[in-house]
Amino acid sequence: MIEWICATCTFNESRALQYLQERQGIRDPLALSVVMANIKQESNFTPNICEGGARVEYQDCHVGGYGLIQWTSESRYVGLGIFSAKYGLNPSTFDAQLRYMSNEYQFQRALLDWQIPGRTYEEYHAAAYRWLGWGIEGPRKTYTYNYLDRLSKVSDEKVQSTSSDQKRLGYLEKILGVIGIKV
């Protein structure tokens, strides 16, 4: 079930957000934002990216990490190839990597924390570190709160925005409507 959407997210970001909710059962918007922020930090949701920025196929990345979460260790990198071959997938694609990522032991262990609603940023972030074990923290926290601000709760009747920018836009549209300008 999808409870959260992101109208301003890219296609791949939206697909990941949907997958994390429907297939992984993550419901808390902060937990979703932490996972999304970490994928953004690692690859900007670009599946065929080799560490350093080169866009290459899976078999052509020979240095550093590869893919959505920059699989770096030999066992995790090779695991992507084995998993993809087993299921007839191309390891350079978004779908193959999302499926592999969510089946990895490290992700499954962190998932147990992300599935518990109402935890703090620090708790969800600690689970993300156990999942990825990054060397560079980067702007993960900034990305997290950016996603959190952009998520909108889906209700039966309407979408309730959590974004202050979208609220401002709605207010501006009302003002323009009053003076006869249709947006």
Feature locations, PLM:
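Peptidoglycan-targeting cell-wall enzymes and recognition modules
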Residues: 2-19, 40-119
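Short runs of predominantly hydrophobic/aromatic residues within well-ordered alpha helices
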Residues: 31-35, 68, 97-98, 124
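A charged, amphipathic interaction segment
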Residues: 93-163
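Short acidic/histidine-centered micro-motifs embedded in hydrophobic/aromatic stretches
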Residues: 37-41, 52, 130, 134
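Polar low-complexity intrinsically disordered regions enriched in Ser/Thr and small residues
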Residues: 55-56, 67-70, 82-84, 136-141, ...
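Generic structural signal of hydrophobic/aromatic residues within well-ordered alpha-helices
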Residues: 16, 76-84, 110-112, 127-128, ...
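Feature targets compositionally biased, intrinsically disordered low-complexity regions
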Residues: 24, 51-52, 78, 87, ...
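Extracellular cell-wall/glycan-interacting regions and their flexible linkers
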Residues: 1-36, 54-55, 145-183
